[in-house]
Amino acid sequence: MALQRRTTLTKYLIEQQRETNNLPADLRLLIEVVARACKAISYHVSKGALGDALGTAGSENVQGEVQKKLDILSNEILLEANEWGGNLAGMASEEMEQFFPIPANYPKGEYLLVFDPLDGSSNIDVNVSIGTIFSVLRCPDGQQPTEQSFLQPGTQQVAAGYAVYGPQTVLVLTTGNGVNCFTLDRELGSWVLTQSDMRIPVETREYAINASNERHWYPPVQQYIGELKDGKEGSRQSDFNMRWIASMVADVHRILNRGGIFMYPADKRTPDKPGKLRLMYEANPMAFIVEQAGGAATNGEKRILDIQPKSLHERVAVFLGSKNEVDRVTRYHLETKK
């Protein structure tokens, strides 16, 4: 019986390093460390109640959100896995108010790691897919970062990815040369390439939005969703299906595989806030991945990757997925603004 040749994450990254000359060794090693941390998080997620990791931790993060035990554990895993490797100048996490400088007793590198350690954590206790989102930037200030060092537009990302902890654990990755998906082989402990050069279909008949907030939406979103709900009898002359998991990684992963549009708009309840999702930890890495897969991502008015962050925890509205639908809802926003 012939041995089946499979491409592991390590092999894929080494081949990219050789073929494109566009993947520095330090960046390759950093991605591998993040992937190992995601394996550890996946293990704790899969233990569920058996690992005493369910439930709340009795604390809030900088966003004012109640932290789950797994939120805190996942954050610690990512920090501890990456602080000593010598590839990073600093890290920033959705769960921490300030950025995390690399301790003085460890070597430092030229990259910055930004992450949401456990996206969709409201779903932990009900066993719905959750995940980790991460982004890598170069540190413009050498090895002594300040908060300003992190405040770079998404176009400056050198890598981004997410892991989904679901029926399978998968890692989706881009280094600016397309999007690939790796599945965790638990028997071997390796990430194995299972989807290459992922592409989002341009046309779609699915959309993801929290429809319970409809009464709070601004007119452009109400107009767009109204057209989708009207189906064949309306101006779009086609039926659309709504899918909403309330876990960004799960919703985006579905869209990456079969098309669709994900929307988390600003609304009238908090008119002083431009949205709910975090630009640095969620919107930028997902926008990078989606664009690399042929999709589009905007805040309703401009490309997400072009937004200049003003703070580590800045929030934005998000519309991403199949290009034609993102372009349409963005056009409605711009027409309303005229």
Curated annotation (Swiss-Prot):
This protein's pathway: Carbohydrate biosynthesis; gluconeogenesis
Reaction it catalyzes: beta-D-fructose 1,6-bisphosphate + H2O = beta-D-fructose 6-phosphate + phosphate
UniProt cross-references to Gene3D superfamilies, sorted A to Z: 3.40.190.80, Fructose-1,6-Bisphosphatase, subunit A, domain 1 (3.30.540.10)
GO biological process, one term: sucrose biosynthetic process
Source organism of this protein record: Paraburkholderia xenovorans (strain LB400)
EC top class named in words: hydrolase
Subunit field text: Homotetramer.
Record-stated family: Belongs to the FBPase class 1 family.
Cofactor(s) this protein requires: Mg(2+)
Name of the protein this chain belongs to: Fructose-1,6-bisphosphatase class 1 1
Keywords recorded for this protein, A-Z: Carbohydrate metabolism, Cytoplasm, Hydrolase, Magnesium, Metal-binding
One of the Pfam families matching this protein, by short name: FBPase_C
